[in-house]
Amino acid sequence: ILKSYSGLGKNIECLAAAQAITELTFLLVGNNDKQQNYLSCVLAHLDRIYLYEESKEEDIKMLSMSIQSLIHLLAIGGINLPIHHCCKTGEPIIPPLGNWEWSCYYLPSEGFSSIEDPQSNLKINASEVALLQRLLFPELPIKSNGELLGPKKVWLKILFIIETWISAQLEKELSSLKMLREIYS
């Protein structure tokens, strides 16, 4: 045994986050399928979850770590959330931070559109799009004061996007994401 993650069950949040990684891995990687960098990404995210220290205050860091891990694994698995380009026009999506009039529309089977679409089931603002785009980076989006960017309601909105994207693209739902939603709602 090279690594053991026996402590992942220390709380329900960590367990659900680790289970989400496992469930998505089963869906994305076949038995003989060799995904470049997939295992190292899984291990890096499991390490992060394993090393997580729970705080006494309401903490959404585990939720954000789980969401980011799934975004990374979806990208490596070839079904990345297409958050950088409009699915209707192909134009880059560059959220104008501070412009509260600007919005983007999420379509679970296509991606994000800068053009309003009747099939869209979610409207997101510029700061939410920018946060979602930052989740592709290795580190969590942390403010200069050390706090996580975005309130809980935004992270739950991003969780909804991940849930519906996985469901639309892989035609399966992850039970662990329902668990995370229940824990943080």
Could you tell me what each predicted segment is?
Residues 1-185:
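Non-catalytic alpha-helical scaffolds and adjoining flexible linkers that form interface surfaces
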